[in-house]
Amino acid sequence: MKSFLAASVVAVATMAACATPARAAGETLTVCLDENLPPLSAHHRGKPDSGFDVALAQAIADRLGRPLRIQWFESKLDEDSSPALEANALLSDGRCALVGSYVLTRDSLVAPGVKTAKLPDFDGATRPDRTRRVPLGVLAPSQPYLYSPLTIALGPQAVEKARDRHIAGVGDLAGMRIGIESGTLADAILMTFDNGRLIDDITHLVPGRDDLLGALERGELDATLLDLRRLDAWRAAHADSRIAASGYFYPIGVNRGYVGLAGDEALLGAVNKALSDLQAAGTIASLARAAGLTFLPPREPAVLGDVWQKILGK
């Protein structure tokens, strides 16, 4: 009888172990993506969903043998929120298993300093969803799949000015009309460069209110320092744009990857395997090109340390 019971326990355990992967394989993979982050991800009424991250999420879901669902959200940061808290709230509330294109820095992955956070606005949100607070977990990253640097973009008049000189660093912008968005990383870089050498050349604009690239296009400014993704998006939306890429990338950039919750090692391990396979096959680079995104492979360190210390120390 004991032998029969032992055999039964082994059989049940074996069946459960065999059933778990099959069940996981058929389970929908839900990925949260920002609805207004072209050409990484875009979701607008009346238009098909688009972007590099949409295609990459589908490729990963295919590798895992799971159907894909995108949970779109809108990031409207205020003084009580941050990208890290928004991502954590979405994951901790079970809205998705992964958040895509997450910026991998040490600060963005530390345990939250608060116990709860509000959810960002998301597709399907109810009125109570917009006010309630979610108990937070701890974030865990995947391996990176994309490197995002800051680059110098030049307006049409600056292209003429810089024709005889190569833009090899932010110091080469001296004497140009530099536009920058207040409170951004690029603002800190330019304002502190060489003990403030560029300060008199800088005009500050308000993010979300002033049109930085529009002013550059119209010739009201000569140059700016911004996320390469934004330049890609502008040029894709304005086929006749005269804004030129300088080809210069600021030496401190960040990797992007997925982020999930600590404790979901099985999913993150499977995603990392899929990312490695897709990277080796050249698929990730191909998806980026198809989306109009300048692809730069991830760089070491995978997770950037103290950004401000690196900038102020340069």
What do the predicted segments below correspond to?
Residues 161, 165-168, 185-192, 242-244, ...:
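Ligand-binding clefts/hinges and TM-proximal coupling segments of bilobed small-molecule sensing domains
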Residues 60, 85-92, 152, 173, ...:
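Hydrophobic residues within well-ordered alpha-helices
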Residues 25-110, 205:
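Extracytoplasmic small-molecule ligand-binding "clamshell" domains
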Residues 92, 100-131, 189-193, 217-252:
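A ligand-binding cleft/hinge motif common to bilobed small-molecule-binding domains
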